Amino acid sequence: IFNPSKLEYMRVVKEDGKVVSHVPVAPREVVVNGDRFTIGIISPTGTHADYRHRGHGTRCLRDCLRLMNESDWPVSVLWTREATFPFYHNSGFEAVGPQARGYPLRPRDHDVFERGHHDIVLYNPGNPDHLEAIIDIHDAERLRISRSREEYEHLLTLPKMTTLLAMDMGHGVAYLVVSRATNKLGIIEGGGDARALEALFKQSLLLRDS
């Protein structure tokens, strides 16, 4: 979101000649069984400690919601800590529980996954076949976030991100994106053949163990 081309999606409040509060909304197209609609993702928000409790963050957030209404984006999504729920609830957001199960994995858990016959390689941004394979795998998912080629390239080359590819007869059949960043720690996303994904999980845990 922090890109000059995205300025229209950022809202700020200035006081004493400086920016003291900021809330962006990032539009993302969601694909569900062929149907498409746009959601607005709220993140990351912040207000300078010396200027909090003055309504600045709320003003920014509500202007983002105004933009969503004018753009016909029917749903807004955000991930936050429980302590901030009242702030968002005040502007119409509701807390929801997880819609799926999560399983924490430790490096030693690699033993529960089969390695299989797949060759595993690191994603190479300079190899167009790698990018094409990941795009084809992701775009075949019935439930997904739609991305442009440039957005794929950006995601896969973010700092502290590692992308693993499982190859079968020279073709990419699964991928796994793993992050070491403190704000997005762990597995970001993956897709493809189930057996190949299992091999990628095993390899990612072995890499963490090393």
What are the roles of these predicted feature ranges?
Residues 94-195, 200-203:
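Amide-forming acyltransferase catalytic core, primarily the GNAT-like/NAT-type
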Residues 19, 70-75, 81-100:
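Conserved active-site alpha-helix within GNAT-family acetyltransferase domains
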Residues 42-53, 187-196:
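A short, internal acetyl-CoA/4′-phosphopantetheine-binding micro-motif in the GNAT/acyltransferase core
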Residues 1-31, 142-165:
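Active-site rim helix/loop that mediates acceptor-substrate recognition in acyltransferases
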Residues 12, 18-28, 39-46, 171-180, ...:
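Conserved beta-strand in the GNAT
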Residues 51-63, 195-204:
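Conserved acetyl-CoA pyrophosphate-binding loop and the N-cap/start of the following alpha-helix
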Residues 29, 200, 207-208:
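OB-fold and OB-like single-stranded nucleic-acid-recognition modules
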Residues 61, 66-80, 208-210:
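Conserved GNAT acetyl-CoA-binding A-motif
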